[in-house]
Amino acid sequence: MSIEVLLNEFKEIAANPAKQLNDCKAAGKKAIGVLPYFAPEELVYAAGMMPFGIWGSNTKTINRSKEYCATFYCTIAQLALEMLLDGTMDQLDGIITPTICDTLRPMSQ
């Protein structure tokens, strides 16, 4: 498999988080959303579930999350909240929010 094929596959995965989540759920797996950076993914695997990284999306626009986020919040947090608000991540069975920064700390509320 060539590097171009692999890169195109990664681009497709990154551009379609909802499709990846749907594929996971269609396979009968439970999915737990994990926000960056230090969520204990090993615990999710140990519980027989799939950790699903919520890092935002290159295809999303920040709209609804602006109502909840201060202007200094990073794009990763704003896009993650956007995907949670617009239904992209509705199939998640739960979310782990590490509180490593001032932006993610209030996201757990």
Residue ranges of each PLM-predicted region?
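An N-terminal assembly and electron-transfer interface module characteristic of large anaerobic redox
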Residues: 1-109
